[in-house]
A protein has these predicted regions:
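Asparagine-centered strand-capping/turn motif at beta-strand->loop junctions
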Residues: 56-65
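Low-complexity, acidic Ser/Thr/Pro/Gly-rich terminal tails and inter-domain linkers that flank the onset
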Residues: 20-49
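Terminal connector regions
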Residues: 113-168
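Short, hydrophobic/aromatic beta-strand segments
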Residues: 64-72
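Single-pass alpha-helical membrane anchors
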Residues: 1-22
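Hydrophobic beta-strand positions in extracellular immunoglobulin-like domains
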Residues: 58, 77, 109-111, 145
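Hydrophobic core residues within well-ordered beta-strands of beta-rich domains
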Residues: 50-52, 71, 103, 139
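Intrinsically disordered, low-complexity Pro/Gly/Ser/Thr-rich segments with frequent PxxP/GP/PP motifs
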Residues: 81-122
């Protein structure tokens, strides 16, 4: 037997293992479902940053855990003057979605008052002063999630609730 034969056999085994892993990743990409279910003002306190909460439901139909390595979502509200980006969600940790499970997770996004656009700031100022204000009932979210070996775009309209969960 030639000295190269074990290496060729080892290379073949490594190739089979790689292709098997690749097949699992492709399968996982086809079996991951997500839905941004809603956006709500979470914290509304003058002495602290405004906080928006974004709920995302993940469903993993694959037989392996899926690890989401990056998630990036811009949140837009449609005011009378047009659509305005109010926040960007970018969690710093990976998210593990266990095999064959559904998981709804809340993500909080802090926004400094000075970083709000003029229209949103005016609406919040009116609200602080006790005036009636009109708020959008839906938000537009745009971004992507990246997992092991694949990227899924996010682009949808979701319900928005301007009633803060935590307030002064």
């Amino acid at each position: 037997m030639s000295p190269a034969v074990p290496f060729i056999l080892l290379g073949g085994a490594a190739l089979v293992a790689y292709l098997s892993t690749l097949k699992k990743v492709v399968n996982a990409a086809q079996r991951l479902r997500y839905q941004v279910t809603r956006v709500q003002i979470y914290r509304f306190k003058l002495d602290r940053p405004l906080v928006f909460r974004v709920w995302i439901e993940f469903t993993n139909l694959a037989d392996i855990d899926i690890i989401i390595q990056a998630l990036y979502i811009d949140i837009f509200l449609d005011f009378a003057t047009g659509q305005q980006r109010i926040a960007t969600l970018y969690p710093q940790q990976s998210i593990v979605i266990p095999a064959n499970q559904r998981k709804e997770l809340p993500f909080d996004v802090e926004v400094k008052w000075v970083n709000l656009g003029a229209t949103a700031f005016q609406m919040l100022l009116k609200r602080i002063n006790g005036e009636e204000t009109w708020w959008p009932t839906s938000a537009h979210v745009d971004g992507e999630l990246k997992a092991e070996g694949f990227t899924i775009p996010i682009n949808m309209d979701v319900p928005f609730n301007a009633q803060p969960i935590e307030k002064e």
